């Protein structure tokens, strides 16, 4: 038993299904000095498995007319797909695959780290309001994981590695 709980809420108004997979892991579960790792791993779960190439997960969802995305918070990370209801089995298989079989190498991880750094620049570093919120949160939660930004501190994101990402994935996902 891996603790997976399934909740099904029927809605017959449209022939679509929305699948959300919520992992009980987020930024608050990161080790000191590894801020941003939970969010980084969220990005990396779209980068391929033993049976899917990098980016193929989202391409397959789009090919069947669906959409997908993910988000990270302090206490959880969630992945979702919305597709025609007859494609539910397809997306469940894809999620099960990346839940167990993520494959990472520096060729995939290092460019994605740059993507996360750019995301931080655009959302936080280039926004005085976002910088203020980040500093207020840091002051409110001294010596607590909630004081670190979910996206991570720039200097710590720069030091995230393939090994750290795989260790986090194995501990919290696989």
Residue ranges and their predicted role:
Residues 3, 12-61:
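Active/ligand-binding-proximal structured segments within catalytic/core domains
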